[in-house]
Amino acid sequence: MIIIKGEYMSKTKKTNAMRILDRAKINYQMTTYEVTDKHQHGEEIAQLVGAKIEEVFKTLVLENSNHEHYVFVIPVNETLDMKKAAHVVNEKKLNLMPLDQLKQVTGYVRGGCSPIGMKHSFKTTIDASARNLEKVYISGGQRGMQIIIHVNDLIDMTKAQVESLSLIHI
């Protein structure tokens, strides 16, 4: 079942992430927001879709020195701890993937990168804070779209491990 929020949905085609969720018969909601020319940060997106900041998650794609890719899903108001990220995937060091390669590798663009439905299956890790929530907002697979999904469904669909990934702010 899909529940759609937002006035722009009627003009929008389903993304790969939505088609995969539909095929798997996973319940989710879709919400949209107006996209601007500038990069919109997660805090702004949370406000635009009426979500609590801790419910909105961003998808980061990192790579090792051999250009093997890993996906990390963390709250938009948090910073990925690169050492923790490398440790949980048994790598010495990881770097953010160059933005100019994101679409080629994942099929998605910056600001529209969903952990569901990438071109290839990558090892995915979701921040442990998601376990404290029933549902989370993730990118719907294009800028201006957010999927609201049960945490356990997200974990199952991405075959993710759940680990503490965020920097601890003191």
What are these regions (language model features)?
Residues 2-168:
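Extended, low-hydrophobicity, polar/charged segments
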